A protein has these predicted regions:
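Extended hydrophobic packing segments that form well-structured cores
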Residues: 1-31, 36, 44, 48-49, ...
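Short helix/loop capping segments that flank catalytic or ligand/cofactor-binding pockets
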Residues: 14, 78-79, 207, 213-217, ...
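N-terminal glycine-/serine-/threonine-rich phosphate-binding loop
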Residues: 32-62, 340-341, 347-348, 471
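A short, acidic, amphipathic alpha-helical segment used as a generic capping/interface helix at domain edges
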Residues: 52-55, 299-300, 304-316, 349-357, ...
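N-terminal active-site beta-alpha-beta segment that forms phosphate/nucleotide-binding
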Residues: 54-116, 347-360, 365-367, 371-377, ...
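Well-ordered mid-protein domain cores that form the structural environment of catalytic cofactors
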Residues: 82-163, 183-189
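Conserved, well-structured core segments that form the ligand-binding/active-site neighborhood
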Residues: 132-321, 328, 348-361
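C-terminal catalytic subdomain
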Residues: 340, 344-447
Length: 514
């Protein structure tokens, strides 16, 4: 059969055996039905007025309260007119105004964590013209700055040693509200440093997305606050080899140490703030449409949202495990332009596929992936990546985990920090999160082929094999690794559509068990 796979800004055609199994999210197996557009406002309002495990906003918020509404950045969630963020913010504002909260006491805060701080065009795209114009010109929209210590609160360490530093405005508000997508010291001694605006607010609201995520199963809930409004030292408690290379991390589930740390850090933030986050998370489909909406306390709301999201995300598909997994990388996806050409980002994307689909892969599985791999690092977005790539080839760095000892050195390099704060770049420590993930592909495959690379030496420097075409790569894999009749899984559009976590057909029902 002939199939097209993403390659650069176009596609590369592959001739694969007719026995190849093809999976396209939302098409091969249909998503659960989404909420009709005309019912979204009412469904969102009903969720917000009937929160799980805590009182509604009309009882939590009062005249004179300060409120921070925490919003995911542009990486996930959709920007269509009916996107969850747009609708949830408007409904929440109506509830706050009805409770006596004044507009001047409300801040919209983007929870970008170590991602590039949300740009003005991105703010406009995410919020829409009406919301943007209501709040931007009065300086009531901001993006979390994890290096502005005037806006951070050091909460110390969890009992398990994790450092928690959070956004000061969220900490100080009367009611913190998290709008998400179900996408001091804690019990593990993790250091917690958080955003001060959130810490100081009377009401902190998290708007999120319950969306399949290789890091801990789902976005949203406590993952949102633990990664989005904290500091690199806090994120270094979980986005590291010691956590990501454990057996409980692959395949993806909500039962991993990483997920436990998200939850523990989130609860610790609530303990120090003196009140819980008010969450409003939407379960999203392949096209970022709302399947269901849940509000309330993250601890009680998360499991209920996951139960619904499991039906869309953990897909029983394979009758037997696969020898070969085939897909393609565009240049621009997920973390931005250059994701499919920057070698460190390429390796992270390859590994994310392993984390999601390990349940259907044989132990000696081979990956074949198209990438233009032309040397485009997008240095403005990932200014540290070229230096990391060069260092990886020197000074006894045999595998990517050997680079971990340089994390603090890069995380404190002033020029990289300035580019994160003021020039739209990722934080330098994000590169170490990416490398922690990137090694997982090597850990779980016999070989990985990049086909169509314009600069194949870059791919080979990351331990990847290179061939000109899918057909050449498959022939080599059949000769050396998988035999003459491999079971092949093809994943067209895998980086263009909302991802799933593939499972065996005879697996136990429910996420983490299929």
């Amino acid at each position: 059969m002939k199939l097209d796979f993403e390659y650069g800004n176009g596609v590369m055609t592959a001739q694969l055996p007719d026995s190849t199994k093809v999976f396209v999210p939302g098409q091969t197996v249909s998503d659960p039905p989404h909420i009709p557009e005309e019912q979204l406002v009412e469904a969102t309002r009903n969720s917000i007025r009937n929160p799980i495990g805590m009182p509604p906003l009309c009882q939590l918020a009062h005249a004179g309260n300060t409120v921070v509404i925490v919003i995911p950045d542009i990486v996930k969630g959709g920007c269509q007119p009916t996107a969850h963020r747009k609708i949830a913010i408007r409904v929440i504002l109506d509830e706050l105004y009805a409770a006596g909260v004044e507009k001047k006491d409300i801040l919209l805060l983007f929870s970008n964590g170590l991602h590039p701080r949300t740009s003005v065009p991105e703010m406009r795209k995410i919020l829409g013209e009406e919301l943007f114009n209501e709040f931007y010109h009065t300086h009531q929209i901001d993006s979390h700055d994890s290096e502005n210590y005037d806006d951070l609160v050091d909460l110390g360490y969890t009992t398990h040693g994790d450092h928690v530093i959070m956004n000061k405005r969220v900490f100080a508000c009367d009611l913190p509200i998290l709008i998400g997508h179900t996408q001091g010291y804690t019990d593990h001694g993790d250091h917690v440093i958080m955003n001060k605006y959130v810490y100081d607010a009377d009401v902190a609201i998290l708007i999120g997305h319950t969306q399949g995520n290789p890091y801990g199963g789902y976005s949203g809930g406590y993952k949102h606050c633990a990664t989005g409004i904290t500091h690199w030292r806090c994120i270094a408690a979980h986005h590291v080899p010691e956590v990501m290379h454990r057996k409980d991390f692959v395949p993806v589930s909500t039962h991993s140490m990483m997920r436990n740390k998200f939850d523990e850090i989130g609860r610790y933030m609530e303990e120090k703030m003196g009140h819980p986050f008010f969450c409003c998370d939407a379960v999203l489909d392949t096209y970022s449409r709302q399947i269901a909406i849940y509000s309330g306390c993250a601890e009680k709301m998360q499991p209920i949202a996951w139960e619904v999201a499991d039906k869309r995300t953990y897909v029983p598909f394979a009758e037997e495990k696969f020898d070969v997994m085939v897909f393609g990388m565009p240049i621009d996806f997920h973390y931005g332009n250059g994701m499919g050409t920057n070698p460190i980002q390429m390796m992270q994307a390859l590994s994310a596929q392993v984390i999601r689909h390990k349940r259907v892969m044989k132990e000696n599985c081979v990956i074949i992936c198209s990438s233009i791999c032309d040397g485009y690092f997008h240095d403005e977005r990932w200014p540290y990546a070229r230096e990391l790539f060069d260092l990886f080839g020197h000074d006894y760095h045999q595998t990517l985990p050997d680079m971990a000892s340089l994390g603090e050195y890069f995380a404190t390099k002033e020029e990289y920090i300035r580019k994160y704060r003021f020039a739209g770049a990722f934080h330098p420590y994000h590169g170490f999160s990416m490398m922690s993930c990137a090694h997982i592909a090597e850990m779980n495959t016999s070989a990985i082929y990049i086909v169509g690379a314009r600069e194949p030496g870059i791919a080979r420097a990351m331990g990847l094999k290179t061939r000109a075409t899918f057909e050449e790569a498959l022939a080599d894999a059949m000769k050396k690794y998988v035999g003459p009749s491999p079971n092949i899984l093809a994943l067209p559009q895998t980086f263009k559509l909302g991802a799933v976590h593939l499972c065996m057909k005879d697996g136990a029902a429910g996420q983490g068990h299929c």
